[in-house]
Amino acid sequence: MSKTHFGFETVEETDKAKKVAGVFHSVANNYDLMNDLMSAGMHRAWKAFTIAQANVRPGYKVLDIAAGTGDLTKAFAKAAGPTGEVWHTDINESMLRVGRDRLLDKGIVTPSLLCDAEKIPFPDNYFDVVTVAFGLRNMTHKDVALAEMRRVAKPGGRVMVLEFSKVWEPLKKAYDLYSFKVLPWLGDKFAKDADSYRYLAESIRMHPDQDTLKTMMEQAGLDAVKYYNLSGGVVALHLGTKY
């Protein structure tokens, strides 16, 4: 059997999805708190930048993968308007439920779908914009997921990946201290779940760096791939176009 990484642990590929599911079932009800802890609240600015770069227009079809509590979905649904079609999707039932309920509470009526990014249940050339925010690093076969995102994008459509990445070297020591010492402590104190937060920190370190992910997107068939480093490389937004 093939091996892969679950944080710093080496596991069977067939086991990773179950382990990741366990983490997100555990953190679903505290996911927004988790984002605040992991990013010191900066995730709102990173998402706002992503929303601006997506440039969703009225009538657009948008697929939000690993959409979680629906921050991007909400913004996209408002931008696409009543003539648009915005899908809120996640592979994790707990996350999907929390996000769906939150969207409804805010008056956003848009379809929610349980969706595996490695087997996207939509036809070719369907979406104007395909996004995944803070989800790619948890996927077992990132190359397959990227190829699927490209497949369902229309010609001229954009694929966008917002993800924790590799920080600039001067920040590395402080970032490691925060990730491996402070974050698990905060997870234990506020969510009673140090292990899940420890995994999330480890998963960031195992994720491809900015240039490697750019190459992976190009290998998936995307063109004009570029990325923006945000907050000193703590996060990067990658964008590619399907021609």
Swiss-Prot record:
Domain of life: Bacteria
One of the GO BP terms on file: aerobic respiration
EC number in record: 2.1.1.163, 2.1.1.201
Positions with a binding annotation for S-adenosyl-L-methionine: T69, D90, D116, A117
Keyword S-adenosyl-L-methionine: yes
Top EC class of this enzyme: transferase
One Pfam family recorded for the sequence: Ubie_methyltran
Involved pathway(s): Quinol/quinone metabolism; menaquinone biosynthesis; menaquinol from 1,4-dihydroxy-2-naphthoate: step 2/2; Cofactor biosynthesis; ubiquinone biosynthesis
Family named by the database record: Belongs to the class I-like SAM-binding methyltransferase superfamily. MenG/UbiE family.
HAMAP family found in the cross-reference section: MenG_UbiE_methyltr
Protein name as catalogued: Ubiquinone/menaquinone biosynthesis C-methyltransferase UbiE
Gene: ubiE
